Regions:
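Short beta-strand segments that buttress and anchor functional surface loops
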Residues: 57-63, 93-98, 128-133, 238-247
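N-terminal cleavable signal peptides for secretion/export
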Residues: 44-108
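Short, surface-exposed coil-to-beta transition loops
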Residues: 73-78, 110-114, 139-143, 251-255
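Bacterial N-terminal signal peptides
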Residues: 27-41
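A short, structured loop/turn motif at beta-sheet edges
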Residues: 48-53, 81-90, 118-124, 229-232, ...
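Hydrophobic/aromatic-rich structural module bridging two neighboring secondary-structure elements via a short loop
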Residues: 93-150
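N-terminal secretory signal peptides that target proteins for export/translocation
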Residues: 1-25
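Mature, soluble, non-transmembrane domains
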Residues: 131-296
Length: 296
């Protein structure tokens, strides 16, 4: 038991940090939605998607693996807030995780991650900043902004961890635009979607994300009884694969499964944190009031 925990803690600057970025936080952005209209492939009209600005709280906990001799546990909480700022969407995310074991003398490690982003409603402009903490000490910080032209090409200007500017390839999407595109694909009956997405909190380069979209269903695990905002709203399983540096084997760097409602709320998530099987359960859902926007 002690060896397993110690190994996981020593991986704090590699596997754990990458696990944080590639798992919980990046694809909670699936609920970060962009209003507007896109066209689906082959000229099919985009399905209407009505998103729900909200604040959601998730309880994170490790899952037991049958037959495992040693167990490293992780638990925590994630707070996700999506705000309509009239000209764009502001996203606030904060997560805390505690890694430890079942023995009283085991060392515990605490991790915290914060992110604030803003994206214009036309999917062309994007600002981001994130920071990580390990046992209360500040770690990685990232800050920058990106833009995408009507031609599909884009550019990134970074402030942290280093200052610089570089181009983005044609066809790249910003995260909120990609999130809405996923919901539109699901509502239109598509079963698969692949895109290059620039997020900034993971890498200065775009990430290839593939999504397998399942059929929709009502009353998933009776969550609509607990959360009135989910009543009469379909949800569906979405399996995501992330490719940071695609190799010849074609294997993803990370995978994650979500139960996603058609209004953008995530009901459940299943992922891996530093090799530990994890789940995230929706425990609180507050609907945000709409901003009073001035006419342009």
């Amino acid at each position: 038991m002690a060896r397993a925990v110690a190994m996981a803690v020593r991986l704090g600057n590699s596997s754990i940090r990458q696990g944080i970025r590639r798992s919980i936080f990046r694809r909670l952005g699936l609920a970060i939605l962009l209003g507007g209209t896109f066209m689906l492939p082959a000229g099919r009209p985009a399905a209407a998607v009505e998103v729900l600005p909200h604040k959601a709280i998730y309880i994170l906990h490790s899952r037991q693996v049958p037959g495992a001799e040693e167990t490293v546990t992780a638990d925590g909480m994630l707070i996700f807030e999506w705000i309509d700022t009239c000209d764009g969407w502001s996203i606030n995310q904060r997560a805390k995780l505690r890694l430890g074991g079942g023995d009283e003398d085991e060392e515990e490690a605490g991790f915290e991650w914060r992110q604030i982003t803003w994206e214009s409603k036309d999917g062309r402009r994007y600002r981001y900043q994130s920071e990580e903490f390990r046992n209360g000490e500040r770690g990685d910080q990232r800050r920058g902004e990106a833009s995408v032209e009507s031609s599909g090409k884009g550019a990134v200007t970074t402030a942290l961890p280093t200052r610089g500017r570089h181009e983005l390839p044609a066809g790249v999407m910003l995260p909120t635009a990609h999130s809405l595109r996923l919901l539109q694909a699901a509502a239109s009956g598509e079963g698969f979607l692949s895109a290059n997405v620039f997020d900034g909190t993971v890498s200065d380069e775009p990430i290839t994300i593939t999504a397998a979209l399942g059929p929709g269903t009502l009353h998933w695990h009776d969550q609509d009884k607990q959360f009135p905002a989910l009543a009469k709203v379909q949800s569906r399983p979405v399996d995501l694969a992330f490719f940071l540096n695609p190799g010849p084997e074609g294997l993803p760097d990370f995978e994650q499964s979500l139960q996603v409602y058609d209004n953008g709320v995530i009901g459940k998530m299943v992922f891996s944190f530093a090799g530990i099987p994890m789940e995230g359960d929706l425990r609180q859902l507050d609907v945000s009031s709409k901003e009073k926007c001035k006419a342009p």
